[in-house]
Amino acid sequence: MEYTVYKERLKQLKCAVIIPTYNNEKTIKKVVDSVKDYCDDVIVVNDGSTDHTSVILGEYSGIQYISYKENKGKGYALLTGLRYATEKGFDYAITLDSDGQHFADDIPTFIDRIEKSLEAF
């Protein structure tokens, strides 16, 4: 699969992928690796994990990693990621859970939807 085209489309849209996580040591590596295939602008928010999630995420370069010690809930993690994305100049964000329920393979569909919504204006 040619991922470069998706990376370029996301860059043109100024779109990042935000991954909130909490105690997902068994799935976080697979999720981040698959998202990085599609997108260079990955923001991971570690919501106070008490397992080895932070160790795994610490091994990555090329992701934006935000972490706090106390679990504050998924909503707070999403808001943190969205605020960060806005501060960094992104106009759009795609959120994917880190437990493996959502798949990076869905990113092209999200890109299509964003581009289609732009055509309405």
Give the residues covered by each predicted segment:
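Short beta-strand-to-loop acidic/aromatic patch adjacent to the donor-nucleotide binding site
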Residues: 90-101
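Short hydrophobic beta-strand elements that form part
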Residues: 16-20, 43, 67
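Substrate-positioning beta->alpha
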Residues: 27, 102-110
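A conserved acidic beta->alpha catalytic loop
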Residues: 46-55, 100
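Conserved donor nucleotide-binding strand/loop of the catalytic core
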Residues: 54-88
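Conserved donor NDP-sugar-binding/catalytic core segment of glycosyltransferases
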Residues: 108-121
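N-proximal low-complexity "stem/linker" segments adjacent to membrane-targeting elements
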Residues: 1-34
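Short beta-strand/loop segment that forms part of the nucleotide-sugar
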Residues: 32, 40-49, 66, 96
